Amino acid sequence: MAQQCFHSEYFDSLLHACKPCHLRCSNPPATCQPYCDPSVTSSVKGTYTVLWIFLGLTLVLSLALFTISFLLRKMNPEALKDEPQSPGQLDGSAQLDKADTELTRIRAGDDRIFPRSLEYTVEECTCEDCVKSKPKGDSDHFFPLPAMEEGATILVTTKTGDYGKSSVPTALQSVMGMEKPTHTR
């Protein structure tokens, strides 16, 4: 009985073992015919060649793209410095000029005061809840509490006490104010 061998092997009944087909391609057994057929071998080799070429080109193109982007960033660092610092600001140089002007004006007085244009700015809220509610106190901006945010839920709990031996009133009776006093004097 012949043993099951791999696709590229045949069973040698003299040795009772599987042997590679490439050893018998000059006179192949029936199981090695597809492996040793030159037309099948060349088509498989052609497929592997196409795959290796595709993989090589992909690797070369990705390395070239990375190198070009790296070189462009190194050659043009001024473009990154000119970008606006805050999302609402369109011209970053105008903000720096304003800061320099305020800084020179402040240096005549107290050195510990920093210009307001260098402070961190927060954009105004544009949602309906923020527009309807007015900020309180000295704050320029309104930050809603977590329970007021969209999708938040509020947990409401009630306290119950031991009313002695009488039964505890139901929640509906407590809410409606219909509970009867348990202790009478």
From Swiss-Prot:
InterPro entries on file: BCMA_Tall-1-bd, TNFR_13C/17, TNFR_17
Molecular function terms from GO: signaling receptor activity
An example Gene Ontology biological process: adaptive immune response
Keywords attached to this entry: Adaptive immunity, Disulfide bond, Immunity, Membrane, Receptor, Signal-anchor, Transmembrane, Transmembrane helix
Described purpose of this protein according to its UniProt entry: Receptor for TNFSF13B/BLyS/BAFF and TNFSF13/APRIL. Promotes B-cell survival and plays a role in the regulation of humoral immunity. Activates NF-kappa-B and JNK.
Domain of life: Eukaryota
Localization annotation: Membrane
Subunit structure: Associates with TRAF1, TRAF2, TRAF3, TRAF5 and TRAF6.
Pfam families: BCMA-Tall_bind (PF09257)
Disulfide bonds: 5-18, 21-32, 25-36
Extracellular side: 1-49
TNFR-Cys repeats: from-to residues: 4-36
Name of encoding gene: Tnfrsf17
Organism lineage: Eukaryota, Metazoa, Chordata, Craniata, Vertebrata
Source organism: Mus musculus (Mouse)
Ranges per topology, Cytoplasmic: 71-185
Annotated Gene Ontology cellular component terms: membrane
Recorded topology in the membrane: Single-pass type III membrane protein
Transmembrane portions of the chain: 50-70
Tissue: Detected in spleen, thymus, bone marrow and heart, and at lower levels in kidney and lung.
Identification of the protein by name: Tumor necrosis factor receptor superfamily member 17
